[in-house]
């Protein structure tokens, strides 16, 4: 590895330890020429996940986009940001583990709704109203009635 201080192409690893929940390795290095120390991180390069939108266009998976939607749905609700970040982590982990490079956007939306339903029901209805594009109050009321019925049966509603 090239030293960031003197550009010499020789370093020693002094310390190596897992980092970020074993997703990467933090290494403390020392340059063999100038003897200055620096830190590097090594992690697996993940292949990009592409989301196929309803109109057929593709865009790279964005954790931030999902988190923004969750935060907006949970505005003025007692839901800690950490819970929402865990939801995003779970969704990304599930999407990456399915082995597909391209995921339909409606699959992502349904995964978000499924998890949000268990986090906060009001936030779930808010998210659903935007995601499913409720056209009028009757559709909105129908979703609320399904939510109440599902709460009695304690399972996640499907379209």
Swiss-Prot record:
Family designation: Belongs to the NrdR family.
One MF annotation (Gene Ontology) recorded for this entry: ATP binding
Domain of life of the native organism: Bacteria
Zinc finger (unnamed): 3-34
Cofactor(s), by name: Zn(2+)
Keyword tags: ATP-binding, DNA-binding, Metal-binding, Nucleotide-binding, Repressor, Transcription, Transcription regulation, Zinc, Zinc-finger
HAMAP family per record: NrdR (MF_00440)
Function statement: Negatively regulates transcription of bacterial ribonucleotide reductase nrd genes and operons by binding to NrdR-boxes.
Cofactor stoichiometry and binding remark: Binds 1 zinc ion.
Residues of the ATP-cone domain: 49-139
Official protein name in the record: Transcriptional repressor NrdR
TM helices/strands, residue ranges: none
One of the GO biological process terms: negative regulation of DNA-templated transcription
